[in-house]
Amino acid sequence: MTLLKEFFIVGAGGFVGSVMRYLMAVVLASASLKHGFPYATLAVNVLGSFMIGFLSQPFSANPYGRLFVMVGVLGGFTTFSTFSNETLLLYNNGQFIFASLNVLLNVLLCLVGVFCGFEAAKIIL
């Protein structure tokens, strides 16, 4: 596999993942705005973590599939930088409980998501 081909595979997957991320933000925007908590970011991080756990075994032997789905799609879908920025904004706005809750929920639920994805893959695949 050539490096240029790998770039295109990852880029195509990243495009798909980024569009999926944007759609989740649009769908969950009203809840996030209404309650002042970044629900969309939490949702994509937990779902992305589950999917990484679920798909890691099936794509481990397929280098093209792994690059497209694991690196591209899920890399473009999950949002650690957005999570970090939103946490800092909450903290800077004096919302210390929401900032702490955001860190706790993202870390805990994403770990649970990966674990559940692994377990679901064992059962389903």
UniProtKB/Swiss-Prot annotation:
Belongs to the fluoride channel Fluc/FEX (TC 1.A.43) family. One of its GO terms (molecular function) is metal ion binding. InterPro entries: FluC. It catalyses: fluoride(in) = fluoride(out). It comes from Elusimicrobium minutum (strain Pei191). It is a multi-pass membrane protein. Na(+) binds at G75, T78. This is Fluoride-specific ion channel FluC. It is found in: Cell inner membrane. Its main location: membrane. The keyword Isomerase does not apply. The chain crosses the membrane at residues 7-27, 36-56, 63-83, 96-116. One of its GO terms (biological process) is cellular detoxification of fluoride. Na(+) is not transported, but it plays an essential structural role and its presence is essential for fluoride channel function. GO terms for cellular component: plasma membrane. Fluoride-specific ion channel. Important for reducing fluoride concentration in the cell, thus reducing its toxicity. Keywords: Cell inner membrane, Cell membrane, Ion channel, Ion transport, Membrane, Metal-binding, Sodium, Transmembrane, Transmembrane helix, Transport.
